Amino acid sequence: MAHILAVDDDPDLCTLLKTALERDGHAVEIRTSGVTVTESLCRWADCILLDVMMPGEDGFATCRRIRAITQAPILFLTARTDEQSVLTGLGIGADDYLTKPFRVAELRARVAAHRSEERR
């Protein structure tokens, strides 16, 4: 079981993420804005799912803050498909970048892969 932090401003997607990942036995904490991600929450998380386009603080700024606190895998889940966004996300420390819409099975597989890499 992993502790997964999901940060996205879309409540329907948050519900989908929580349901799918809890079904796999993970504990899932949801935040709808990057500014609500605290240091203690970052330290709790074994894996972080992060949107890019959010009000208040975008996902890139949130990723930079998180990366200064923890080395837990960060996976972007975003509608931003342009090459510059992908390169920016990976360049600032994200471990993976999935574009919306995504398949839940693929998300589950990527979370599992990053979790097993971290345990090595």
Region spans (language model):
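Acidic, metal-coordinating helix/loop segments flanking the phosphotransfer/catalytic sites
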Residues: 30-47
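The feature encodes the CheY-like receiver
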Residues: 14, 55, 82, 100
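Conserved phosphotransfer cores of two-component systems
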Residues: 41-44, 65-72, 92
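Active-site residues of response regulator receiver
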Residues: 51, 78
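C-terminal output helix
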Residues: 84, 98, 102-115
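Acidic catalytic/metal-coordinating carboxylates
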Residues: 32-33, 58-61
